C-alpha cells in the first residue's frame, strides 16, 4: 500500500517567528479538525532555508517531516546563494522539492539540472519530490501526456524510483485558483504511474489545493496525497487538508 503524503510548500513565506507561531496554532487545529494526525498520513512541511532549523527543532518527535524547496547538485563549492545536500541532511531535513515550475520559470531550471539535483538528494539520503506538469497552452494543444512523459524521461535516468515522490502540478492551476478536475488529475497521475511501471511510487497532486476540494481529490484511487501551496500557510486550513475525509466514489462523482 502506498503512503499518503500531505506536503505544504511555504515558498518564500514566513520568518522564523512566523514559523513558530504557525506551529503553535497548527497542532491544536490538527486535533480539533478531526481525531488528530492519522498515523498513515505523513505531514511534510517544505519551508524556506532560513526556517529549516527552527521547524526541525519544533517538530521533533511529532511525526511530521521537514523538507527543503531546492538544493544544488554539488556537495560544496563556489555557488553563491546555494544549499547542498550535506547541509540539508545535517539539519535533519528528510525531503526536498526538485523541479518546481517556479524554479523552472524564474531561475532557468532544466530537466538536466533537475536530474542532477535528484541524484544529489538521493546521494545524501534525502527523498526528492519531483514536480512535473504542463502549461495551459500545452494542455489546449493536446500535449499534456507527451510533455509530462518527456519531463520524466529526461529527469529520471539513474534515479532510484524506490526513494522518490512525484508531484503532478499543472502549471495553469498553480496559484491561480483553478483546480484541475479531480477525475482528470487522477487520469494523468495514472498515466505517469503506468509510464514508469512503478505501482509503489507515491504520486501527489498540486495546484490550488484547498480545504474545499481536498476530500474529492483524495477520493481518487491514483492520488496518494497533495502538494499544497497557499493553503498550507494557514494553520486552520492546512489542518483540515491533513484531516481530509475522502468521499465515497458515488459522492465524488456527484455534480
From Swiss-Prot:
Entry binding sites for substrate: 9-11, 175, 208, 229-230
Classification via Gene3D superfamilies: Aldolase class I
Catalytic residues identified in the record: 100, 169
GO cellular component: cytosol
Keyword Metal-binding: no
Alphabetical UniProt keywords: Cytoplasm, Gluconeogenesis, Glycolysis, Isomerase
Purpose: Involved in the gluconeogenesis. Catalyzes stereospecifically the conversion of dihydroxyacetone phosphate (DHAP) to D-glyceraldehyde-3-phosphate (G3P).
Assembly behavior: Homodimer.
The protein, known as: Triosephosphate isomerase
Gene that produces this protein: tpiA
Amino acid at each position: 500500500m502506498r503512503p499518503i503524503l500531505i506536503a505544504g510548500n511555504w515558498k518564500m513565506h514566513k520568518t522564523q517567528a512566523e514559523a513558530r507561531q504557525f506551529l503553535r496554532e497548527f497542532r491544536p487545529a490538527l486535533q480539533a479538525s478531526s481525531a488528530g494526525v492519522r498515523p498513515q498520513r505523513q505531514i511534510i512541511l517544505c519551508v524556506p532555508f532560513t526556517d529549516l532549523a527552527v521547524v526541525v527543532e519544533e517538530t521533533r518527535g511529532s511525526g511530521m517531516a521537514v523538507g527543503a524547496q531546492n538544493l544544488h547538485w554539488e556537495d560544496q563549492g563556489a555557488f553563491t546563494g546555494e544549499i547542498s545536500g550535506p547541509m540539508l541532511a545535517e539539519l535533519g531535513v528528510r525531503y526536498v522539492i526538485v523541479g518546481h515550475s517556479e524554479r523552472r520559470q524564474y531561475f532557468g531550471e532544466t530537466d538536466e539540472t533537475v536530474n542532477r539535483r535528484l541524484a544529489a538528494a538521493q546521494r545524501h539520503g534525502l527523498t526528492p519530490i519531483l514536480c512535473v506538469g504542463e502549461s495551459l497552452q500545452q494542455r489546449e494543444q493536446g500535449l499534456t501526456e507527451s510533455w509530462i512523459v518527456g519531463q520524466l524521461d529526461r529527469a529520471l535516468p539513474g534515479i532510484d524510483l524506490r526513494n522518490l515522490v512525484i508531484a503532478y502540478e499543472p502549471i495553469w492551476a498553480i496559484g491561480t485558483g483553478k483546480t484541475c478536475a479531480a477525475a482528470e488529475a487522477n487520469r494523468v497521475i495514472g498515466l505517469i504511474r503506468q509510464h514508469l511501471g512503478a505501482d509503489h511510487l507515491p504520486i501527489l497532486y498540486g495546484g490550488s489545493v484547498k480545504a474545499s476540494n481536498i476530500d474529492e481529490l483524495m477520493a481518487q484511487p491514483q492520488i496518494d496525497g497533495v502538494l499544497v501551496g497557499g493553503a498550507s500557510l494557514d494553520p486552520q486550513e492546512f489542518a483540515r487538508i491533513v484531516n481530509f475525509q475522502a468521499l465515497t466514489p458515488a459522492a465524488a462523482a456527484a455534480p
